[in-house]
Structure formats: structure tokens, C-alpha cells
């Protein structure tokens, strides 16, 4: 159980915020190795994409290997990151892309393991 005063501990919030932005930079340059590294290497990993679904790290690795580098730019809006204690964080953002009028939404659930922070669940969607 997390004490109420353990929400958004400054050092944990700073750590996750930096990882969130590093993930975004890796996504935009299609750094597949970095992207795969940030996701939990476990069959319980879940990622819902815009038009795809990966259940488990092996499916995610296969998806990333087949994905092309983005041919658009992305601007993030309304980034909201909340941490609970030293081991759990949720990151949400809205985004716009240069190739569509649709509005994007993204969420990531991060957990700190012995080998560092990992995304254990993620969701990306686009809406009118």
C-alpha cells in the first residue's frame, strides 16, 4: 500500500519524466532496440496500438521489427505523469501528428523491477 505522501515523490517523478521523454525520442527515430528494452520482457505484457495488439514481449519485438520509422512528426500535449511510491508510475499524453487531423492518446504503466523501470502495459489510440 502506498501512503498518500508517497505520490509524486520528486526524485521518482523526475526519473519517470526523463524516461517518458527518452521513450518518445526513441519512438520518433525508430530505435527498436531501445523501445524493446523499455518494455517488460514477460508474456503478461500488453500493448494496444492504433491498429494492432501485442500480448507478450515476443509479439512486441516482432511488431517493432516489422514497423517502419514514423514518416510524421508528433507534438505531445497535456502530459500527465503520476508516481506511487518508488515502484509504480502512470504516464498519459495527448498528441497531434503532422499526417492526420485525428487526435492521439497514449498511456503507459511503468513498474520498477530489479533491472530498472519497464512499461508493463501501454495503449495508443486516435480519435476524431
Range-by-range predicted roles:
Residues 48-50, 122:
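Residue-level detector of high-confidence beta-strand sites
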Residues 12-15, 50-51, 59-103:
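Surface-exposed, charged secondary-structure patches
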Residues 34, 46, 89-90, 118:
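General beta-strand recognition
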Residues 23, 34-36, 60, 91, ...:
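Hydrophobic pocket/interface hotspot
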Residues 41, 84-85, 113:
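Structural motif
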Amino acid at each position: 500500500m502506498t501512503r498518500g505522501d508517497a505520490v509524486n515523490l520528486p526524485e521518482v517523478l523526475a526519473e519517470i519524466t526523463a524516461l517518458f521523454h527518452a521513450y518518445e525520442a526513441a519512438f520518433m527515430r525508430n530505435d527498436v532496440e531501445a523501445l524493446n528494452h523499455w518494455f517488460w520482457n514477460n508474456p503478461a505484457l500488453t500493448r494496444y496500438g492504433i491498429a494492432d495488439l501485442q500480448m507478450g514481449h515476443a509479439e512486441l519485438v516482432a511488431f517493432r521489427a516489422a514497423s517502419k520509422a514514423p514518416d510524421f512528426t508528433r507534438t505531445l500535449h497535456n502530459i500527465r505523469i503520476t508516481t506511487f511510491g518508488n515502484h509504480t508510475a502512470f504516464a498519459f499524453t495527448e498528441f497531434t501528428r503532422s499526417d492526420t487531423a485525428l487526435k492521439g492518446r497514449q498511456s503507459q504503466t511503468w513498474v520498477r523491477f530489479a533491472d530498472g523501470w519497464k512499461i508493463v502495459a501501454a495503449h495508443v489510440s486516435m480519435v476524431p
